[in-house]
């Protein structure tokens, strides 16, 4: 396996994306990842199968589990219009209904999930993977004076979760978008590692590589590599030479060039071998590159593999 660790990220777990997720949806997320025929079990088996061909990995692969946001309002958009300001909607913990207008109840929900994930990992007994920490899903974090801080209070809630994770020997991670609010305060939140998304791959990219490098160095960040597969939204974001329909992708050459600039700039600017890297590849994007019969696709795939396996930080 190329990567040392994997993020288990779920972006939408409610039936209606406009409503905030409830406890039942958080449980559904757990059931998905810990299904004996899917999720972590499938990854564990995949590594076992690979070990039969190329030998056992030097260590277990780490899993970082995403923490959904305990959102203040049941329906945030309606609340901002004054139509639905319900904050007691999520469910209960030990028979007590959580009221997400209280930061202490939002913290309780976070810690409930941390405990639930740890318990399920202990019970599952995977051979090749292990839980190494938790990932804050929100890509921007608020501090006093920030946008609608009173509904978020991340400096209170996230720091409390970080402290708890560290008390039970779990890591704490964050991957914000480029120049996101909260990056400048990231050390105060208690993260073990913050990795910034350059967001350079997409057509509406706002930042230059000089600006990206400066932010990474100033705040001690890692860097995310980014591309989309054929599930990219919009479809013009796909790096593959062909679309799902089999038709040529007219945006493929542009997208390949943009992605390879990540690798080239990481090396040229001395970030390679110095800062941690993570990969975002959309839905199945890395797999699609790996099995593609297209020569240009395979060239990009092999350049990415070479970038990963030869990284001095892996040695």
What is each residue range found by the language model?
Residues 59-61, 128-132, 166-172, 190-192, ...:
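Short, well-ordered coil/turn segments that N-cap beta-strands
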Residues 1-111:
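N-terminal catalytic cores of secreted or lumenal carbohydrate-active enzymes
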Residues 50-58, 118-129, 183-190, 211-219, ...:
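Acidic (Asp/Glu)-rich catalytic clusters
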Residues 113, 141-157, 162, 166-210, ...:
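Extracellular glycoside hydrolase catalytic/binding regions
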Residues 179, 193-315:
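Substrate-binding cleft of secreted/luminal carbohydrate-active enzymes
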Residues 43-51, 110-122, 155-162, 209, ...:
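Generic structural signal for well-ordered alpha-helices
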Residues 59-72, 96-113, 131-139, 158-183, ...:
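Aromatic-lined carbohydrate-recognition surfaces of secreted/lumenal glycan-active proteins
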């Amino acid at each position: 396996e190329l990567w040392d660790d994997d993020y288990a990220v779920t972006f939408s777990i409610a039936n209606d994306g406009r409503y905030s997720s409830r406890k039942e949806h958080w449980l559904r997320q757990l059931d998905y990842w810990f299904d004996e025929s899917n999720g972590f079990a499938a990854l564990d088996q995949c590594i076992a199968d690979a070990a039969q061909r190329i030998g056992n990995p030097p260590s277990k692969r780490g899993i970082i589990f995403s923490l959904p946001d305990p959102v203040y309002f049941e329906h945030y958009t309606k609340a901002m219009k004054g139509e639905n300001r319900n904050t007691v909607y999520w469910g209960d913990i030990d028979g007590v209904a959580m009221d997400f207008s209280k930061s202490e109840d939002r913290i309780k929900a976070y810690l409930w999930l941390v405990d639930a994930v740890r318990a399920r990992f202990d019970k599952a007994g995977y051979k090749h993977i292990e839980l190494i920490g938790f990932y804050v899903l929100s890509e921007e974090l608020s501090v006093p004076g920030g946008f609608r801080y009173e509904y978020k209070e991340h400096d209170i809630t996230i720091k409390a979760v970080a402290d708890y994770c560290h008390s039970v020997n779990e890591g704490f991670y964050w991957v914000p978008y480029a120049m996101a609010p909260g990056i400048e305060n990231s050390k105060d939140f208690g993260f073990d590692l913050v990795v910034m998304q350059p967001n350079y791959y997409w057509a509406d990219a706002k930042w230059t590589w000089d600006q990206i490098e400066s932010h990474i160095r100033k705040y001690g960040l890692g860097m995310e590599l980014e591309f989309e597969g054929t599930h990219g939204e919009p479809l013009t974001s796909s790096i593959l030479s062909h679309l799902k329909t089999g038709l040529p992708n007219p945006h493929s050459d542009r997208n390949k060039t943009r992605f390879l600039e990540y690798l080239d700039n990481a090396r040229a600017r001395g970030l390679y071998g110095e800062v941690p890297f993570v990969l975002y590849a959309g839905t199945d994007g890395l797999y699609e590159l790996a099995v593609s019969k297209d020569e240009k696709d395979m060239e990009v795939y092999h350049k990415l593999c070479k970038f990963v396996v030869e990284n001095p930080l892996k040695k």
